[in-house]
């Protein structure tokens, strides 16, 4: 069984870089916007920074959170949240990623919120992904590939995955219990293969399996802001976007 990644926050030596990325991104927020809030340690810093602006500037916005954890944090810092069922267009989505390749394809889902995160990205008019330099990889696969799977028939789905060459383990909580997503599903973390030269093909193949809700690959229109140890930030985006 794989363990759910733990949050280290301020103990992370890249914490100042995450804070700087968050402060740069929060400057994009304008009055009246609907803002998509991602999940994970860098998204957490963005939510905190956005809460500061809402409080000190009386900034009028609405937001949609991609996970229960992000929702609770947003509520705690005074960010007004939109009912998930009313989600339509989102002016700005800010999130993180577990891996980013040179084509800006990503793996997400280390926190188990991949399905909702991808819905937000799909709805976003502008998507900004914040990562530190450790997340840049030549080929996706160094980080395990999370797959969200419905509980019904999950062992059968695992058998099919293994038959097609995807091997991994079910994610557990720190207490040793099966991890359950905010949608009531399980996460299967694929360890093998450990390299995806054509993630688009793998994603299509995996989504054809009944019982799979979503896959951690993100092939989406998004800017990627990379923070480096020297304090610099490089903004990357695909050609002809935005």
From Swiss-Prot:
Give UniProt keywords alphabetically: Isomerase
Q: Which GO terms describe its biological process?
A: pentose-phosphate shunt, non-oxidative branch
Catalyzes what? Answer: aldehydo-D-ribose 5-phosphate = D-ribulose 5-phosphate
Pathway(s) where this gene product acts: Carbohydrate degradation; pentose phosphate pathway; D-ribose 5-phosphate from D-ribulose 5-phosphate (non-oxidative stage): step 1/1
**What positions belong to coiled-coil segments?**
none
Pfam families according to UniProt: Rib_5-P_isom_A (PF06026)
- Indicate which residues the UniProt annotation says bind substrate: 39-42, 95-98, 108-111, 135
* Residues annotated as the enzyme's active site: 117
Subunit structure, briefly?
Homodimer.
Question: What does the UniProt record say this protein does?
Answer: Catalyzes the reversible conversion of ribose-5-phosphate to ribulose 5-phosphate.
Tell me its family. Answer: Belongs to the ribose 5-phosphate isomerase family.
User: What is the name listed in the Swiss-Prot or TrEMBL entry for this protein?
Assistant: Ribose-5-phosphate isomerase A
**Record organism:** Chlamydia trachomatis serovar A (strain ATCC VR-571B / DSM 19440 / HAR-13)
